[in-house]
UniProtKB/Swiss-Prot annotation:
Family under the similarity heading: Belongs to the QueC family.
Stated name of the protein: 7-cyano-7-deazaguanine synthase
Residues reported to bind ATP: L7, S8, G9, G10, M11, D12, S13, L14, V15, A16, T17
InterPro entries for the chain: QueC, Rossmann-like_a/b/a_fold
Species classification: Bacteria, Pseudomonadati, Chlorobiota, Chlorobiia, Chlorobiales
Function: Catalyzes the ATP-dependent conversion of 7-carboxy-7-deazaguanine (CDG) to 7-cyano-7-deazaguanine (preQ(0)).
Cofactor note: Binds 1 zinc ion per subunit.
GO BP terms, alphabetized: queuosine biosynthetic process
One annotated GO molecular function: ATP binding
Encoding gene per record: queC
Keyword set includes ATP-binding: yes
Length: 226
């Protein structure tokens, strides 16, 4: 059995990779560089995680068109990365318009070519930033798109093992699976030490605190988000 994992290098995609590995899939890993601020750090994390799990079949894709489209603080330097607002009801500026649909389309195409049966993605709907393309209903609908848009003999399904978990539960699950959190990168802003203040850093730090664990990566600051 073969599975493609969409591996950004962040903690969620790392744990999703570990879930697929634990089920005995032969893993193929895809990473997308889309002009994000921390693209180099994320790419290094992707490669280190692949090395850790012995994933030899890798695909690194350049999707600069997402940067050209803009509209996100991750890809447009004129839009500042916001300070975290963990109780806000609006979608933050870090949302990249329809990004996951682009990623999934590429992953489906690759899966069809290499004969993968599953696509693993570390999307999180609960305790998340509220991105519309991280909802379970989106992935249910995309599975239907795959069914209609691939060859009749193709059977590819999207797996979202973390979709209904709180971030702290993802940390605990990662600890149980002995994942190398030290190799992952989540910060939206910095490629040196993680900033500790962006939405992604805040949610990660809070998750580790609630799980009773220490995040092993370096931060410029470690605010208490509990």
């Amino acid at each position: 059995m073969r599975a493609v994992v969409l591996l950004s290098g962040g903690m969620d995609s790392l744990v999703a990779t570990a879930e697929a590995d634990a089920l005995g899939y032969e893993l193929a890993a895809m990473h997308v560089n889309y002009g994000q601020r921390t693209w180099h750090k994320e790419l290094m994390a992707f490669r280190a995680i692949c090395d850790h799990y012995g994933i030899r079949h890798r695909l690194e894709v350049d999707a600069d068109y997402l940067s050209a489209i803009g509209g996100s603080s991750l890809t447009d330097p004129s839009i500042p990365v916001e300070e975290a607002d963990l109780h806000g009801a609006t979608i933050p500026t870090s949302y990249v318009p329809f990004r996951n649909a682009s990623f999934l389309s590429m992953a489906v195409a690759w899966s069809e070519v290499i004969g993968a049966e599953k696509i693993y993605i570390g999307a999180v709907e609960e305790d998340s930033s509220g991105y519309p393309d991280c909802r379970k209903v989106f992935y249910d609908a995309f599975n239907r798109v795959i069914e209609l848009g691939t060859r009749p003999e193709t059977a590819i399904g999207i797996e979202t093992p973390l979709i209904e978990l709180q971030k702290s539960a993802i940390v605990r699950r990662g600890i149980a699976l002995q994942v190398p959190f030290r190799l992952s990168w989540s910060c939206y802003k910095s490629e040196g030490k993680a900033c500790g203040h962006c939405d992604s850093c805040a949610r990660r730090l809070r998750a580790f605190s609630l799980a009773g664990a220490t995040d092993p990566i370096d931060y410029e600051q470690r605010p208490d988000y509990i």
